[in-house]
């Protein structure tokens, strides 16, 4: 419950943002005329991107054209909880958090912008914004951490891209639905240099169903947005047949500058994605570290981090320890000991 003020603050920031220009929302919605799925690849924890996503989700011109909002930040094994929650059911905070915490991404989804998507879909349905109920589809691998004790146990769930593509196949495409798919930018790229390591979610969907997916990534650099003639934020451009189609995809990466030369074999924007979105920079939002003061949760995070380290070499154990320490420091400042008389 300690994190609630931070989540509320995040929602106030989202609500106070400048409304999205009508053409950006309308132009993205128009892609549903010819595609079943619009995928937006976000930069994790980006306040600007999620401000735009919230505005788009609450705009009937877009959200009422989709049947589903599918998200990377949710465990597909817990789909029944998502269905209950977004239909107005009463779930405990533990049940709600389990949907995004019970994944193989140990920390990122604690950022309030992700929970906000869950709450927005619930609110859309409660207010009957659309003639039909919008379903929240949890797209990530059906991992059960209670049955994972070693790296070998985790390996079957390592290919998250295929897992998300399979979920989209089962829950959206096979049902002839239209959907918004929200993932990290990595998963939205249709052409990469590392296909030997496995296909991205967008690549798999595109190969199974050519033309079904319209993928979008954001341009975080204001300098790149200016060079690409994006116009004031938020602004959107489709790649095919436009002035950005044959421009280096490197311009969509954080930190791009006008003096940066393109890589010798860099792909073009039109080769990698179908459109780009500029939302006015990229500032990150983080949850209160006090959420890690729950000793049971912190212990379980350390256990999961050790298993992930054994499988991938990525080490989150020290990060968890640092977050717990930071949480204690904040707690001490917020609750100083009484001054003796």
What is each residue range found by the language model?
Residues 7-16:
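Bacterial N-terminal signal peptides
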Residues 1-7:
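Bacterial N-terminal signal peptides that target proteins for export
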């Amino acid at each position: 419950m300690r994190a609630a003020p931070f989540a509320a603050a995040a929602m106030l920031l989202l609500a106070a943002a400048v409304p999205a220009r009508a053409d950006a929302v309308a132009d993205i919605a128009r892609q549903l005329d010819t595609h079943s799925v619009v995928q937006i690849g976000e930069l994790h924890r980006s306040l600007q991107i999620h401000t735009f996503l919230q505005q788009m989700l609450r705009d009937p011109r877009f959200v009422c054209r989709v049947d589903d909002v599918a998200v990377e930040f949710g465990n597909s094994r817990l789909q029944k909880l998502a269905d209950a929650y977004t239909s107005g059911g009463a779930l405990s905070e533990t049940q709600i958090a389990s949907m995004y915490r019970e994944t193989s991404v140990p920390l990122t989804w604690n950022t309030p912008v992700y929970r906000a998507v869950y709450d927005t879909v619930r609110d859309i349905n409660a207010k009957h914004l659309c003639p039909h109920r919008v379903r929240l589809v949890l797209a990530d691998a059906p991992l059960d951490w209670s049955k994972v004790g070693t790296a070998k146990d985790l390996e079957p769930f390592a290919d998250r891209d295929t897992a998300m593509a399979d979920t989209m196949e089962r829950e959206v495409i096979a049902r002839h639905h239209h959907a918004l798919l929200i993932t990290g930018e990595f998963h939205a790229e249709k052409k990469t240099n590392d296909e030997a390591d496995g296909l991205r979610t967008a690549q798999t969907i595109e190969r199974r169903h050519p033309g079904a997916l319209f993928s979008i990534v954001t341009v975080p650099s204001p300098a790149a947005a200016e060079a690409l003639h994006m116009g004031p934020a938020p602004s959107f451009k489709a790649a095919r047949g436009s002035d950005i189609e044959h421009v280096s995809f490197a311009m969509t990466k954080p930190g791009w500058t006008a003096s940066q030369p393109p890589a010798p074999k860099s792909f073009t924007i039109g080769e990698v994605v179908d459109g780009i979105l500029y939302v006015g920079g990229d500032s990150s939002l983080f949850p209160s570290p006090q959420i890690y003061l729950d000793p049971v949760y912190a212990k379980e995070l350390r256990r999961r981090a050790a298993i992930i380290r054994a499988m991938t070499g990525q080490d989150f154990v020290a990060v968890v320890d640092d977050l717990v320490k930071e949480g204690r420091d904040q707690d001490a400042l917020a609750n100083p000991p009484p001054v003796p008389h």
